From Swiss-Prot:
Component of the A-type ATP synthase that produces ATP from ADP in the presence of a proton gradient across the membrane. One of its GO terms (biological process) is proton motive force-driven plasma membrane ATP synthesis. GO terms for cellular component: plasma membrane; proton-transporting two-sector ATPase complex, catalytic domain. It comes from the Archaea. It holds the Pfam family vATP-synt_E. One of its GO terms (molecular function) is proton-transporting ATP synthase activity, rotational mechanism. This is A-type ATP synthase subunit E. It is a peripheral membrane protein. InterPro entries: ATPase_E_C (IPR038495), ATPase_V1_Esu (IPR002842).
């Protein structure tokens, strides 16, 4: 729930920057091919006296090398684009707790974490600032909602403040089950799908 919203939101925010980088890469590819065609044409004329067959072979070799070089360059720029986009996503991730809808995202991550461990007596771990967002009345409402959904008594007790960007960590009282829905852990778990989504959007 919350994880999908996070990844979709920050990928969308980074899209414009990545498209610009890709456009530059495509322009460079065209420049490589154009230069190669000009070089091939010049060499073809220079060796024309040696025979038409030799000239054609030289031209084809130059063009093949140019296409290979252009393809390699495009692949390098594609990976560069993905890496730069991921860096932008990480920057946006740090800023996410400052956004107006962050509390809604946090609540969804908490609910997802409670589902993951199956309810019951739980410990809720947040960073210091997020503990201020989740007051006692909000905590009580969450407990009631989860009890109704899981058909199981659920108690959320605030634990110690953690050094995380945002999101939450949910633990069962006996420590046997842990759901790490911190923003950084959520991002890391979804990294492969984020990369695939970036590639799909841009290429």
């Amino acid at each position: 729930m919350g994880a999908e919203k996070i990844t979709s939101k920050i990928v969308e925010d980074a899209n414009k920057n990545a498209e610009k980088i890709l456009a530059e890469a495509l322009n460079e590819k065209e420049a490589i091919l154009t230069e190669a065609k000009e070089e091939a044409s010049k060499k073809e004329q220079a060796i024309a006296k040696k025979g038409e067959k030799d000239a054609e072979m030289t031209k084809n070799r130059i063009l093949a090398e140019a296409r290979l070089s252009a393809k390699k360059k495009l692949l390098e720029e594609r990976e560069k684009t993905i890496q730069l986009t991921l860096e932008k996503l990480e920057e946006d991730l740090v800023k996410l707790p400052q956004k107006e809808d962050y509390k809604d995202i946090l609540l969804k991550l908490i609910i997802s974490g409670v589902y993951s461990v199956g309810g019951g007596e739980l410990e809720l771990l947040l960073n210091k600032k997020d503990f201020e967002l989740i007051d006692d009345s909000t905590l009580w409402a969450l407990e009631k909602e989860m009890e109704d959904r899981l058909k199981k008594v659920t108690v959320l007790k605030k634990g110690e403040a953690k050094s995380i960007i945002g999101g939450c960590i949910i633990k069962t009282a006996d420590q046997t089950k842990v759901s790490d829905n911190s923003l950084e852990a959520t991002f890391e778990r979804n990294l492969d799908s984020v990369r695939a989504k970036i590639a799909e959007m841009l290429f």
